[in-house]
From Swiss-Prot:
<feature type="binding site">
    <location>
        <begin position="260"/>
        <end position="261"/>
    </location>
    <ligand>
        <name>deamido-NAD(+)</name>
    </ligand>
</feature>
<feature type="binding site">
    <location>
        <position position="165"/>
    </location>
    <ligand>
        <name>Mg(2+)</name>
    </ligand>
</feature>
<dbReference type="InterPro" id="IPR014729">
    <property type="entry name" value="Rossmann-like_a/b/a_fold"/>
</dbReference>
<dbReference type="Pfam" id="PF02540">
    <property type="entry name" value="NAD_synthase"/>
</dbReference>
<comment type="similarity">
    <text>Belongs to the NAD synthetase family.</text>
</comment>
<feature type="binding site">
    <location>
        <position position="189"/>
    </location>
    <ligand>
        <name>ATP</name>
    </ligand>
</feature>
<feature type="binding site">
    <location>
        <position position="173"/>
    </location>
    <ligand>
        <name>deamido-NAD(+)</name>
    </ligand>
</feature>
<dbReference type="InterPro" id="IPR003694">
    <property type="entry name" value="NAD_synthase"/>
</dbReference>
<dbReference type="GO" id="GO:0005737">
    <property type="term" value="C:cytoplasm"/>
</dbReference>
<dbReference type="GO" id="GO:0008795">
    <property type="term" value="F:NAD+ synthase activity"/>
</dbReference>
<feature type="binding site">
    <location>
        <position position="52"/>
    </location>
    <ligand>
        <name>Mg(2+)</name>
    </ligand>
</feature>
<keyword id="KW-0520">NAD</keyword>
<feature type="binding site">
    <location>
        <position position="180"/>
    </location>
    <ligand>
        <name>deamido-NAD(+)</name>
    </ligand>
</feature>
<dbReference type="GO" id="GO:0009435">
    <property type="term" value="P:NAD biosynthetic process"/>
</dbReference>
<comment type="function">
    <text>Catalyzes the ATP-dependent amidation of deamido-NAD to form NAD. Uses ammonia as a nitrogen source.</text>
</comment>
<keyword id="KW-0067">ATP-binding</keyword>
<feature type="binding site">
    <location>
        <position position="160"/>
    </location>
    <ligand>
        <name>ATP</name>
    </ligand>
</feature>
Length: 275
């Protein structure tokens, strides 16, 4: 099997979708998980104001609202978590996303103090963090906060990982990649936009340039600049289209060297890392 087809199969991407059917699929998936694990009462998700968390948040709130109505269990909640590092540059987008999602509960945890404390502790141990590694600290601190909230509310942490991120490994290991359940898995970036359009989301929340915004030295660095390919390229690749060889090799290069991010910790029985 050609590597492109192997990747498409592994990530479950369809060449085209019915947006409303995929919305229903994700909502039912979340509801089914909570019904099967009835001791769980909350879905917890960090909201940044970007496309992915806005979509996942809306799906979570709809799943919880439906399940609450169906079961009469008023303890079921969706908790949206604001996780700024100091002052968020696109604060208004985050507020707009919250207004669109209309979550049951909103918590704000400013991670700056925790990140700086960790950095200082490492400095005292003789390690000075690079800006890139500090960026990963931010992502992991955000996930740590979400798991603390989930632990105190009988919750599960929801992820925003989708196929266009997964294929490039464009997430922090045990940061935004360390979640319990991922309702967007199988969708590429343009398909996520289709779902948001069908849900009536304000366009500026999904037409803005995606950015992880983790590095202080390169604030709001667009994902596409970091990756060296566009999301249009990645989406075309995941839909099975033929791309320029250089672009295809770039995407496949990211996929191969980030394989460890998509797997559990490596054991003596694994050999994927040898290829």
């Amino acid at each position: 099997m050609a590597l492109q087809q192997e990747i498409i199969q592994a990530l479950g991407v369809k060449p085209s979708i019915d947006a409303n059917a995929e919305i229903r699929r994700s909502i039912d998936f979340l509801k089914s998980y909570l019904k099967t694990n009835s001791f769980l009462k909350t879905l917890v998700l960090g909201i940044s104001g970007g496309q992915d968390s806005t979509l996942a948040g809306k799906l979570c709130q709809q799943a919880i609202s439906e399940l609450r109505q169906e079961t009469g269990d008023e303890s079921l909640q969706f908790i949206a978590v604001r996780l700024p590092y100091g002052v968020q540059a696109d604060e208004q987008d985050c507020q707009d996303a919250i207004a669109f999602i209309h979550p049951d509960r909103v918590l704000t945890v400013n991670i700056k103090g925790s990140v700086l404390a960790s950095e200082q502790a490492l400095r005292e141990a003789g390690l000075e963090l690079s800006d890139f590694v500090r960026g990963n600290e931010k992502a992991r601190e955000r996930m740590k906060a979400q798991y603390s909230i989930a632990g105190m509310t009988k919750g599960v942490v929801v992820g925003t990982d989708h196929a266009a991120e997964a294929v490039t490994g464009f997430f922090t290991k045990y940061g935004d990649g360390g979640t319990d359940i991922n309702p967007l898995f199988r969708l590429n970036k343009r398909q996520g936009k289709q779902l948001l359009a069908a849900l009536g989301c304000p366009e500026h929340l999904y037409l803005k340039a995606p950015t992880a915004d983790l590095e202080d030295d390169r604030p709001s660095l667009p994902d596409e600049a970091a990756l060296g390919v566009t999301y249009e390229n990645i989406d075309d690749y995941l839909e099975g289209k033929t791309l320029d060889d250089t672009i295809a090799r770039t995407i496949e290069g990211w996929y191969l060297k980030t394989e460890h991010k998509r797997r559990p910790p490596i054991t003596v029985f694994d050999d994927f890392w040898k290829r």
